Regions:
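A residue-level marker of the well-folded mature domains of exported/periplasmic proteins
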Residues: 1-243
Length: 243
């Protein structure tokens, strides 16, 4: 009876595309009988997939795929339908009016792209009383650091964070992700909803809501763990899409 050996490999950071490509190269050099991958960047890995096809190695995408035509299969949640359901549930919690901010894990993965696009379309088409006022992507921190630092140095934004108080000049790289998130909430005093495209983005948005003490903001997002299950039970999160 033949035995199947499964090797698990992955980048230390889920959005580290270069690391994932390097790991993929290493695994292909071992000529596995098959390859399963959750693709961090929908536009990456095509060269590696071509090499796999040339070597007769079938590739199956899990959770987050790509438009590469040579994939044998993609196994994932219906990201479009589930994001639309999340939008409808959040709109219901918001009583069909108010402002929303999207927190997304990245700009590159297919799952994040589809979830964000479907959520936006559902809100725009079917919930006209709701406006999406911002979208924060966790792989775009540096751009936001530039924006926040520029406003602070111009005197148009004064954070409550004591660590930043009294500084004449703030460098972008000095700002933490939490401070950037606090800026987003401060800039949107009429915010009524937060949508998170995965558990990391969801937790980031929820933490911002709680630091700002904005109990009027409804929170809906993807994935569940012990912490999010507790938050749902306590009413700190209003809805979870569980895969």
């Amino acid at each position: 009876k033949k035995k199947i050996k499964i090797t698990y490999s992955g980048p230390s950071e889920t959005d580290d595309v270069d690391d994932q490509v390097n790991i993929l190269d290493e695994e292909l050099a071992r000529y596995p009988v098959a390859l399963a991958i959750s693709i961090s960047d929908a536009s990456a890995c095509e060269v590696q997939f071509d090499l796999a096809a040339e070597s007769g190695i079938p590739v199956v995408a899990y959770d987050s795929g790509s438009d590469y035509q040579g994939l044998m299969a993609t196994v994932s949640t219906d990201n479009d339908a589930s994001a639309r359901e999340a939008a409808a549930r959040l709109a219901e919690e918001m009583k069909e009016e108010g402002e929303v901010v999207i927190f997304a894990q990245d700009t590159k993965s297919k799952a994040a792209q589809i979830r964000e696009a479907a959520f936006k379309e559902e809100i725009t088409v079917n919930h006209p009383g709701i406006t999406i006022v911002d979208a924060y992507h966790m792989d775009d921190l540096s751009s936001w650091q530039d924006v926040v630092a520029a406003e602070m140095n111009a005197g148009t934004y004064q954070p409550e964070d004591a660590a930043l108080a009294g500084k004449e000049t703030v460098l972008p790289e000095e700002l933490t992700e939490e401070q950037v998130v606090d800026y987003i909430f401060a800039k949107h005093p009429n915010l009524k909803g937060v949508f998170g495209t995965n558990i990391d983005a969801l937790k980031l948005g929820l933490a911002g809501v709680e630091r700002a003490e904005r109990d009027e903001i409804s929170v809906v997002g993807y994935d569940i763990d012990t912490e999010m299950k507790k938050a749902l039970k306590e009413g700190r999160v209003d809805g979870l899409i569980v895969q």
